[in-house]
Amino acid sequence: DLARREADIAVRGIPKHKRPPKDIVGIKLGRISLGYYVHKELLSEASRSQRELTCIRASGRALSLGDLPDPESLGLKSRHLIDGITPRTVAVTNKLGVAALPCFLAKQYPDLMLLPGVPSAHWGYVWLLHHKDLRQSARIRALFKHLSALEEKWPNCWDTSLDNARRAA
């Protein structure tokens, strides 16, 4: 917790419509996109009517879907409520259902794929943050200067949304 001075810096994903708190200073490092991911075997079983595709949801407090459609509009029943990116990822990799996951995380699991017909969507940004009282710290300034210079080289895998693909073209 930066506000309580439990750390000098923090890396956070913040939705695109929000900003860091007033007493926290930061820079955007890159864009994050979300997508509905499913295990390839579960999708195959569902296409053969052997299993039903259901959605693993997060509570509204834990995850905003951003521009992704609601699971119900995709015909997915919500069967499980799991807060936390890591537990939801584990659930999807174990074929429990479909879940909205950050693309940079899901890409690390070759058995996961985007739900067909539902493109990923820009969700927010990765921010590097520090408390405003550390603005004069030489090591904080040096780190932020170095990382902001790398911004153009930041991984595109964090944002696989269509608008990012259009910008790159």
Where are these regions (language model features)?
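Residue-level signal for short, function-critical loop segments
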Residues: K40, K132-L134
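Pocket-flanking alpha-helical
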Residues: E6-I14
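Short amphipathic alpha-helical coupling segments at ligand-binding clamshell hinges
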Residues: R135-A149, W154
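C-terminal regulatory
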Residues: R4, K16-V126, E152-A169
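Hydrophobic alpha-helical segments, especially transmembrane helices
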Residues: G13, T89, I140-A142
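Short hydrophobic/aromatic beta-strand micro-patches
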Residues: L129
